[in-house]
Amino acid sequence: MLKIGVIGCGFIGGQICRAIDKGVINAELYALSDSSESKVLELTTCLKRYSPASMTIEELLQNVDFVIESASQKAVRLIVPQALEAGRDVMVMSVGALADEELRKRLFRLAEQNNCKLYFPSGAVAGIDGINSASAAEILSVTLTTRKPPMGLAGAPHVEALGIELETIEKETLLFEGPASEAVKAFPANVNVAATISLAGIGFERTKVRVIADPTLSRNVHEITVEGEFGKLSTRVENLPSPENPKTSYLAALSAISTLKKILSPVQIGT
């Protein structure tokens, strides 16, 4: 049975661990790692089937078969290269880190050299399968419009740099418009989906992103519009935010769980 190691015990990491513990995913939850030992302890006390060990990154990489990063873009930069060098397959949740072209090329090269797989779940959006299919021909444009309740954008570097007072926003307000390469830096905890869309389609510079704060919303809304030789594709997802972290949509965690199930399944459905 595949031994899983999870790095990052926040909402997404926790949901993945609970799914494995309940038998939704046919794998062994072997190890956890987090900068906060209290988060590891809190998560392990919720589990019934498995008692994963709390390990350092180095210990985890030596003892598991498959690594799940659900921590941060910083963790992707520091840990994922080590995992690939150790010959481990990796699922990356903080996909925004791959806007860094040098890092992206390095990870892809390491995966090839060490015969490893890198997995990037669809996250909190629908339509990645369609974008993947459309990329077999020419894609002309890709636009992501993200709408969130203002406080769901709290702490974003773009918000803090401009001194935007989110609590004073009373109507729909455009906070950012630009390429995905800049969006993932401006809102690293909010628009990881922009990175996934970029990887599936026309890249970080050509993928356009709009971030809107809307006080009338109680959900995180992602709209994708793609035009190309195939025609036009439009999707809209209204995500319930995580009760633990309003920056994260519940669907993002479900996407990770679904990806793991697909990896382990003999039957593959969809692009």
UniProtKB/Swiss-Prot annotation:
Its EC number is 1.4.1.21. The keyword NADP applies. Keywords: NAD, NADP, Oxidoreductase, Pyridine nucleotide biosynthesis. InterPro entries: Asp/hSer_DH_NAD-bd (IPR005106), Asp_DH (IPR002811), Asp_DH_arc (IPR022487), Asp_DH_prok (IPR020626), L-Asp_DH (IPR011182), NAD(P)-bd_dom_sf (IPR036291). It catalyses: L-aspartate + NADP(+) + H2O = oxaloacetate + NH4(+) + NADPH + H(+); L-aspartate + NAD(+) + H2O = oxaloacetate + NH4(+) + NADH + H(+). GO terms for biological process: NAD biosynthetic process. It is an enzyme of class 1 (oxidoreductase). The iminoaspartate product is unstable in aqueous solution and can decompose to oxaloacetate and ammonia. PANTHER family: ASPARTATE DEHYDROGENASE DOMAIN-CONTAINING PROTEIN, L-ASPARTATE DEHYDROGENASE-RELATED. Specifically catalyzes the NAD or NADP-dependent dehydrogenation of L-aspartate to iminoaspartate. This is L-aspartate dehydrogenase. It comes from Methanosarcina barkeri (strain Fusaro / DSM 804). The gene is nadX.
